A protein has these predicted regions:
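Transmembrane beta-barrel domains of Gram-negative outer membranes and organellar outer membranes
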Residues: 20-172, 176-179, 188-219, 223-230, ...
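Active-site rim beta-loop-alpha module in soluble metabolic enzymes
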Residues: 182
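Cleavable N-terminal export/targeting peptides
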Residues: 1-28
Length: 269
């Protein structure tokens, strides 16, 4: 038990580099009674089957397409409720024949509920917030040939710090999850750096985002890439991102060495 507690605090406080993203675009709405919805199309490909730090089966790939539906309601500037529900459009992975061969998954994933609590600050030349986020994972994914989502109850905590100046954005976030059955403890941490711009009576930001995923079965993945956020007209918001696995180690036989593309559209009211 003490080892598990140490792993949790070690991952949460020593890996400050998100899954930490919340609707809408991790930014809005900030006003009392505000709400919004966001859809995200995610396409992920992984090229090899890994074990520890080596390729166990080269060319055994996995391809996943997911549609995420997310919503947020702001009771008060400092208190929000968020919900995230993924739907696996199609997923396909290649395994050795003695481990199932080609397998597929499709359907609803697990629901994630969160209660982000924020403390805002305004300083000379910059403004931002600290966030503390309790989270709950609700199992909704059914049985298939294999499961993209865990189909287990889970509880988590998230911490983040963010600020922006007239031109620049910084976001630091980390979250940790404990599952109630067989899944290992996992954490997701993020470091995002951005440059804000105005063009054609709109505004947005160009970002470089670095993520680190850790599981206490020995799995570690470092991925990074560019993102573009565009505030179209205050009501509609667009985001495009791409990330590449620069370092991937799997503690159990699993796919890795991949790329992830996401296209997000959000509406704020």
């Amino acid at each position: 038990m003490l080892g598990r507690i140490a792993a949790i605090f070690g991952a949460v406080f020593s890996v400050w580099i998100v899954s930490a993203d919340e609707p809408i675009m991790n930014m809005m709405p900030r006003w009392k009674g505000g709400w919004g919805v966001q859809t995200i199309f995610e396409h992920r490909t992984e090229r090899d089957l890994l074990l520890d730090g080596r390729i166990a089966n080269k060319g055994f790939s996995e391809e996943v397409n997911i549609l995420h539906l997310e919503g947020v309601y702001t009771w008060d500037k400092a208190i929000r409720l968020t919900a995230k529900l993924p739907y696996v459009i199609n997923a396909r992975r290649e395994m050795p024949e003695d481990l199932g061969g080609t397998q597929r998954d499709k359907g609803i994933g697990d629901l994630t509920l969160a209660l982000p609590l924020k403390k805002y600050f305004n300083l000379d030349g910059r403004s931002g917030s600290w966030s503390f986020k309790p989270m709950l994972r609700v199992p909704l994914s059914g049985e298939d040939e294999y499961e993209v989502y865990d189909d287990e109850w889970g509880t988590g905590l998230g911490l983040s710090y963010e600020f922006e100046t007239y031109r620049f954005i910084l976001f630091l976030g980390t979250s940790g999850w404990i599952y109630h059955e067989d899944e290992p403890f996992e954490s997701h941490s993020s470091l995002d750096l951005g440059y804000k711009f105005e063009a054609f009576d709109t505004n947005g930001a160009i970002l470089w985002e670095t993520d680190f995923h850790f599981e206490d079965d020995g799995s570690r993945t470092l991925l990074a890439g560019p993102a573009l956020y565009w505030n179209i007209d205050d009501l509609k918001h667009l985001r495009i991102e791409w990330k590449h696995d620069f370092q991937d180690r799997q503690g159990v036989l699993d796919h890795g060495n991949g790329d992830t593309f996401k296209l997000s559209i959000g509406w704020v009211f």
